[in-house]
Regions:
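Gly/Ser-rich oxyanion-binding loop with an adjacent helix/lid
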Residues: 1-89, 221, 247-251, 270
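Catalytic DNA-binding helix-loop module of base-excision-repair DNA glycosylases/AP lyases
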Residues: 22, 236-237
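C-terminal nucleotide
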Residues: 69-228, 240-278
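FabD-like malonyl-/acyl-CoA
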Residues: 15, 237-241
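Short Gly/Ser/Thr- and Asp/Glu-enriched loop/turn motifs at secondary-structure junctions
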Residues: 230-236
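Buried hydrophobic positions in well-ordered alpha/beta secondary-structure cores of metabolic enzymes
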Residues: 13-14, 42, 58, 97, ...
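Short, histidine-centered active-site or binding-site loop motifs used for metal coordination
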Residues: 2-5, 100-101, 233
Length: 278
């Protein structure tokens, strides 16, 4: 097996897991195992055998392919919708920048996010925050702050706003409104930095490669694009949506800081794992 997925980027393990699932489905099941089930098997493997408390989003992205919109209300049967979009039709490209800081030792930081959000949900007698209304949450913030850390509260605030942003972003793409989509990406990234706080580890605040990449990217891009942290955060990569006529400039400038080959200009593949008959 060969791979061009960046090691420690936050997607490498998911890509590996679903590739193995696709291979086994092809060898023994005539490719009949659904992409979502392969993603769920990959998540189980990562949770149980590798001790990484990941969700299902990365595995679904790798297994289903295309840009996808996922509703996790029923964890056993998530609703996955492909969003048909070609960034080139909007004269933009997706750039992924490797900041050369690995996710490998950040399991505790990543795990704290769902743990703290669930702590807020448990205050209301629920398992997940989606079962709590934003209005009810805001009405009890003083009591929440007495019972738990402020970070739990601020991360919960991000959750409610982020869910709304997802719907707005999907709607914008379906309506060919790329300016609104970029605006949502920008506000989502800002919220990740300020409220979700997944840009650098509180256990190692002297190393802030993602922060540097975002700051430099905003300076380089100006009004030519938007950027945000990519994946689970804390390290790994950032993403930037850049106007096509400015992509090479952005790539040249950002690679001055992170090295030649650190900026990858990508296209979103429309398919997940496939068997190719030779």
């Amino acid at each position: 097996m060969t791979s061009e997925v960046l090691q420690g980027s936050g997607l490498s393990s998911s890509a590996f897991e679903v590739m193995i699932g696709a291979v086994l489905s092809g060898l023994y099941n005539d490719m009949t195992v659904s992409p979502v089930l392969i993603a769920q098997i990959g998540q189980y493997t990562e949770n149980i055998y590798f001790g990484k408390p990941c969700g299902l989003m990365d595995q679904c992205a790798s297994s289903v392919g295309a840009l996808i919109h996922i509703d996790f209300k029923d964890n056993d049967h998530p609703v996955v919708e492909k969003v048909d979009v070609d960034f080139s039709s909007f004269h933009h490209s997706l750039c992924i920048v490797d900041v050369h800081a690995s996710h490998a030792d950040l399991t505790d930081d990543y795990a704290a996010i769902p743990t703290e959000m669930k702590e807020v949900a448990h205050f209301f007698g629920k398992e997940f925050l989606r079962e709590v209304s934003e209005e009810e949450f805001k009405a009890h913030i003083p009591e929440l702050r007495e019972k738990m850390s402020d970070r739990c509260v601020i991360r919960a605030l991000h959750f409610f706003k982020e869910d709304a942003r997802v719907e707005k972003a999907v709607s914008a793409l379906k309506n060919n409104d790329f300016d609104t989509f970029k605006s949502v990406i920008k506000s989502s990234g800002d919220s990740s930095y300020k409220y979700l706080q997944n840009i650098y580890s509180n256990h190692d605040e002297t190393n802030q490669a993602v922060s540097i990449a975002l700051g430099l990217s905003e300076d380089i891009l100006g009004d030519k694009g938007v950027c945000r942290v990519h994946g689970g955060g804390f390290a790994g990569t950032i993403q930037a949506f850049v106007e096509d006529d400015y992509v090479e400039t952005y790539k040249t400038e950002i690679e001055k800081y992170f090295g030649k080959g650190s900026c990858h200009i990508l296209k979103v593949r429309k398919y997940g794992g496939k068997k190719v008959e030779l």
